[in-house]
């Protein structure tokens, strides 16, 4: 596990982001010796609440230079946002494919429901939104791979992809009607899972605040 810890008191730091250091901690050694992990039951992945008390970490476990941890972390966060965007795009495409296939197969009043524009248009719109988000994701990845600043692109890609995936999930469930709530179809499960990405690892509101301040030059809101 990687911990971001303050190694210089805030009052002595030139900026709030200074004086933070990354430490590599082996949980196999630390559990019960300074770290207590309490599981939090949820539907997506394994999550724990950590309590850290008098944990000792050897200096050789420091990642990078002391006091420069936040700078190292921020670079990885941009990659994480692009990664989450890619995951949301994959989810969105899954919802679109499932909805389109069902709309072709489901016959009501002797015609497939996909012949109706009221069914077609939401599927087409979800497809457009997902593919548009993918273009922004590629823009973020291209800049990251080139070593160029990509904070704006990575954040916007994550925001667009999370919204597109959620809208595609809602559309897919609506297309399936009552069957969308049947566990065998996996739609209701994936709908609940994809909603996570408007909350974590960074919320949509924080992304909007970042774009407003750092891209558009608006006053800092918090």
List where the protein language model places each region.
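A short core secondary-structure module
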Residues: 1-34
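Short, structured patches in soluble enzyme cores that scaffold and shape functional sites
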Residues: 4-7, 24-27, 41, 54, ...
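Short, solvent-exposed loop/turn segments at the edges of secondary structure
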Residues: 17-18, 45-47, 192
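Flexible, small-/acidic-enriched active-site or ligand-binding loops
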Residues: 27-56
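Alpha-helical interface subdomain recognition
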Residues: 49-51, 55, 68, 72-222
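Cytochrome P450 core scaffold surrounding the K-helix E-X-X-R motif
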Residues: 61-66
């Amino acid at each position: 596990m990687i911990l971001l810890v303050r190694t210089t008191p805030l009052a002595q730091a030139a900026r709030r982001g200074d004086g933070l250091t990354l430490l590599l901690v082996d949980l196999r050694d630390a559990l019960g010796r300074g770290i207590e992990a309490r599981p939090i039951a949820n539907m997506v992945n394994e999550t724990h609440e950590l309590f850290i008390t008098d944990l000792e970490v050897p200096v050789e476990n420091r990642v990078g230079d002391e006091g420069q941890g936040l700078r190292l972390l921020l670079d990885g966060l941009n990659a994480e946002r692009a990664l989450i965007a890619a995951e949301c795009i994959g989810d969105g495409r899954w919802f679109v494919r499932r909805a389109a296939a069902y709309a072709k197969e489901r016959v009501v009043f002797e015609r497939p429901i996909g012949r109706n524009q009221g069914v077609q248009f939401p599927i087409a719109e979800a497809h457009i939104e997902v593919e548009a988000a993918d273009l922004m994701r590629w823009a973020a990845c291209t800049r990251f791979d080139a070593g160029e600043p990509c904070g704006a692109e990575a954040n916007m890609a994550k925001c667009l992809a999370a919204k597109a995936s959620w809208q595609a999930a809602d559309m897919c469930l609506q297309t399936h009607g009552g069957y969308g709530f049947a566990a065998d179809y996996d739609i209701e499960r994936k709908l609940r899972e994809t909603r996570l990405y408007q909350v974590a690892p960074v919320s949509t509101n924080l992304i909007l605040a970042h774009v407003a301040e750092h891209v558009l030059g608006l006053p800092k809101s918090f």
